[in-house]
Regions:
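C-terminal regulatory
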Residues: 1-108, 135-140
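A bilobed periplasmic-binding-protein/Venus flytrap-type ligand-binding module shared by bacterial periplasmic
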Residues: 107-117
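Short amphipathic alpha-helical coupling segments at ligand-binding clamshell hinges
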Residues: 80, 117-131
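A general structural signal marking secondary-structure boundaries and capping sites
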Residues: 114, 133-136
């Protein structure tokens, strides 16, 4: 259907209070918002080919909750740019370390069973997601 990009984001208020990290090493001095269900999403690949293991006081298994925590100024989160970039445009979030944390694209796929059980509503949903993912391009 398309590609999902993940980047680091934090609220302007959080960054004003805690400072903007200048390097991957600086992240160890920041509050990080991590995934509680998918541990592989807490390993943040770097541009230099290494990775940073994110640990933090806040975690969730839900992108909407992680987004709300980041907007509320609780820390830095690695989130889908599809969700966060519109919030950057609104001034609610800022990108962090875009030149140091790898923007690893993740392919988004959908599968349907063949045959008579294909519902038009399912097809319409998949078509909508495909259009949404393909019209959303990285801004960084």
């Amino acid at each position: 259907l398309g590609v999902l990009h993940r980047r680091l984001y934090a609220s302007p208020a959080y960054l004003k209070h805690n400072g903007i990290p200048q390097s991957v090493e600086d992240l160890s001095h920041h509050d990080l918002i991590t995934h509680s269900q998918h541990e592989h999403l807490n390993v943040w690949p770097t541009q230099s080919g290494t990775s940073f293991r994110a640990n933090g006081p806040f975690c969730s298994d839900n992108a909407a909750t992680m987004t709300s925590m980041a907007i509320a100024g609780l820390g830095i989160a690695r989130m889908p740019s599809l969700v966060a970039d519109p919030l950057v445009a609104q001034g609610k979030l800022q990108s962090v370390l875009i030149d140091q944390i790898e923007d690893t694209p993740n392919t988004v796929s959908a599968f349907m069973l063949s045959g008579r059980h294909r519902l038009p509503k399912i097809r319409a949903c998949i078509d909508h997601w495909a259009q949404w993912l393909q019209t959303t391009t990285p801004t960084c």
